[in-house]
A protein has these predicted regions:
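Short, conserved charged micro-motifs
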Residues: 274-276, 355-363, 411-420
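Acidic carboxylate-rich catalytic motifs and surrounding loops in phosphoryl-/glycosyl-chemistry enzymes
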Residues: 254-255, 341, 382-385
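Flexible glycine/proline-rich, aromatic-decorated loop/lid segments
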Residues: 137-140, 269-270, 274-279, 298, ...
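Conserved glycine-rich beta-strand-loop-beta hairpin in the small C-terminal domain of fold type I
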Residues: 323-324, 338-350
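Conserved PLP-enzyme active-site core in the AAT-like
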Residues: 2-33, 37-39, 45-54, 60, ...
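Short amphipathic alpha-helical segments
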Residues: 263, 344, 402-406
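Active-site loop ensemble at the mouth of alpha/beta enzyme cores that anchors a bound cofactor
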Residues: 323, 351-378, 393-399
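PLP-dependent enzyme catalytic core of the Aspartate aminotransferase-like
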Residues: 310, 374, 386-458
Length: 458
């Protein structure tokens, strides 16, 4: 694919420096071979996450200066509510400091008794954790295409609707809620079609099961629908988003992705009734007062601007095109990845790239460590290392994939950076047997990948 020129110009820069391989080896050992333990200043190209790592626009920075820091009822809150309400169409919308805060507030209100199931097209890590912390059992139910990284299909993030109906038939009242993750991060940032969202919603409501949208990448999903779903090519992204949100009863959102802010999130409830009142009580307990939700007024202003900027068609065309450019280079080099690429990242299939490693040796994490050691590039595992142990048996859980995620921050890196990444991955792919596996030497009980300590298996 030909590289799409940036639809913006750069007004501010930050120097980055390359370390030596010897320095990186020492840094990696001091971090206990955990990507989250690396000092950011020792990273040359940081693809750990696209969450909160984007570059804000001049309009967002100007909005920061308008921040009203009133404790209650500030105009920045009112501005955000006007923008969010017009885009998403929900009666009650609550700012929170980030996506997992919305999950912490909402999940205990959905899971009413221990052992209830919450079914998703696929959970991401924090959502899965909060279902478990609320006493529920997270169940992944993605379509079969999403489980084959080599298969090219337009909407590999879709819910398996037939599988959902089977789960409902088997478990009935034991299903507390259904979560629709858009885009579907854990299977490669793959989009979900409007048709699938509609069908899932219809099945859920036939059985009186609430649907929650995990909408961190709402704009990228809308762009894929615009490009790939029949009858959507002449629709605006804003119009597509409005329909997407009609197929949910509530939503949680990390605004640090598509709204391109460094901190912030939203929680929405379609009908301002009993659930909304319970949400308000939890927000006051966990996040602060309702009209700031753990954020400064300046953050609310930047978020209001970013929600609109994320829906710009030229921006989304470039954004997805940049990921496609990286994917095309890796494909030419024979590197296996979840195909087609997602909206925010290339998910390298490390299980296929490093066949000499067993899944319990964490191939996705092993490749991430090697990429840092060789080139100073930080990425992360989306696989069994990311998944916590089974809460009942304490056994390791095998993930559908062993991915290494190259998540590209928004408006930060250029074509040359993508070329460096492609070259580094290609070099490793030529001699995959040199990459060692890893074992965990210490781990916490929940969300272990953030703070675990590991060592290479020599």
């Amino acid at each position: 694919m030909k590289y799409i020129p940036e639809p913006f110009k750069i007004k501010m820069v930050e120097p980055i420096a390359m370390t030596s391989r010897e320095e990186r080896a020492n840094i990696l050992a001091r971090a206990h071979y955990n990507m989250f333990g690396l000092p950011a200043e020792s990273v040359y190209i940081d693809l750990l996450t696209d969450s909160g790592t984007g570059a804000m626009s001049d309009a967002q920075w100007a909005a920061v200066m308008r921040g009203d820091e009133a404790y209650s009822g500030g105009r920045s809150y009112m501005h955000l509510m006007d923008v969010a309400g017009s885009i998403f169409g929900y009666s009650y919308i609550q700012p929170v400091h980030q996506g997992r805060a919305a999950e912490k507030v909402l999940m205990p209100l959905l899971v009413s008794r221990p052992g209830q199931l919450v079914v998703a097209n696929t959970f991401f890590d924090t959502t899965r954790a909060h279902v478990g912390l609320a006493g529920g059992r997270p169940v992944d139910n993605v379509c079969s295409e999403g489980l084959d990284s080599a298969k090219v299909a337009p909407f590999k993030g879709n819910m398996d609707v037939a599988g959902l109906e089977k789960l409902i038939a088997e478990h009935g009242d034991d299903i507390a809620a259904i979560v629709m993750t858009v885009t579907n991060n854990s299977v490669g940032g793959q989009p979900v079609s409007l048709q699938n969202m509609r069908e899932t919603y219809e099945v859920a409501h036939k059985h009186a099961i609430p649907v929650c949208l995990d909408a961190a990448r709402y704009a990228e999903n809308a762009y894929f629908i615009h490009e790939r779903e029949e009858g959507c090519q002449d629709r605006s992204l804003r119009d597509i988003v409005a329909e997407m949100f009609r197929y949910g009863d509530m939503f949680v959102m990390s605004a640090k992705k598509d709204a391109i802010v460094n901190m912030g999130g939203l929680l929405g409830v379609r009908e301002d009734g009993e659930l909304a009142e319970k949400v308000k009580s939890n927000v006051i307990s966990f996040e602060g007062y309702l009209t700031y939700g753990g954020l400064a007024g300046r953050d609310l202003e930047a978020l209001a601007v970013g929600l609109e900027e994320g829906l710009d068609m030229d921006w989304q065309r470039y954004r997805v095109g940049q990921i496609q450019y990286l994917g095309d280079q890796l494909e030419e080099a024979g590197v296996p990845f979840q195909s087609p690429v997602g909206g925010h990242a290339v998910f390298i299939d490390a299980g296929r790239m490093l066949p000499h490693l067993a899944w319990k040796q964490y191939p996705g994490h092993a490749l991430a460590n090697q990429l840092y050691l060789d080139a100073g590039i930080r990425s992360c595992d989306i696989g069994p290392y990311l998944m916590d142990r089974d809460p009942v048996t304490q056994e390791e859980q095998q993930a559908p994939f062993e991915f290494t995620r190259l998540a590209v921050p928004r408006r930060v890196y250029t074509q040359s950076h993508m070329d460096v990444v492609a070259e580094a991955v290609t070099k490793i792919a030529r001699e995959p047997e040199k990459v060692p596996g890893y074992r965990i030497t210490w781990e916490p009980p929940v969300l272990r990948h953030f703070t675990s300590r590991l060592e290479p298996i020599r």
